Amino acid sequence: KHYLPIFSLLFGAFVWGIIWYPYRLMAQAGVSGIYSSLYVFILTLAIALPYFFITKKKIPIWSKDFWFLSVVAGYTNISYVLAVIDGEVVRVMLLFYLSPVWTIFLSHFMLNEDTQKRHYIAAFISLLGALVMFWQPNHFIYLDLKSDWLALSSGIGFAMTNVMTRKHQHMTISQKALAIWIGVIIIAIICILFDKDTMPSFDFFRPVDAFIAITIALCLFFSTLLVQFGVTQIKAVEASSFFLFEIVVAAISSYLLVGESIEIKEWFGGIMIIAGVILAAKN
């Protein structure tokens, strides 16, 4: 009975494991991650609104749950995009996937999901793996890259988003997806207000760039709906294990497309993070 929710999560993981590349192409064309996110999610919203109109879906604009989910998910998406544009893709993914550690604690307090001893052991293993990745001879913990901090904070936001998605059963899947799309647009606009120098030149708006943006928008439209469906059906901590497929996709795509590789200690720390996630999700 969980085949469709599992497929939904794996599809979402695949999309987010490969989507860094078109975002980088847009960045190379002179469009920052903030502006590309704004354009892409406006397109995504444009694709979605006819569906809401035709099906007469209610938009809960007066719901505080809707807007809280919107803001958290919006920050999660923006920070993730900025991290994968500026940082090493696999390193960013591994730091992002400390999210199950945060999910363990959030799901316990917000969802009253059963937290067992193995969950705390899993959290310890994952955090230890992160320390291995960050360790430097002259520093105990060394995060000097903006992309590292963005990846970590995005992972926390992702955990919060998934927990809220499962908690807010009174909201439909399409309403949750709409909250995410609107949230990205809101956060992007707020960022633009404080960073007015990132406006792309009009040379960007070529057919090939428009095609890239539309392709991303379509992928995000379907992946958001499917992930919301999957997370609604499967426990938050268990769902985290299926998102690990994203790391596999990212590792292969970053090597083949841009020749990225990471250090041995980062692989070792990453293996510990993955082991912790699998232990936490073990049913």
PLM features per residue range, with description:
Residues F7, Y39, M93-L98, H168-G183, ...:
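Helix-helix packing/entry segments at the starts of transmembrane helices
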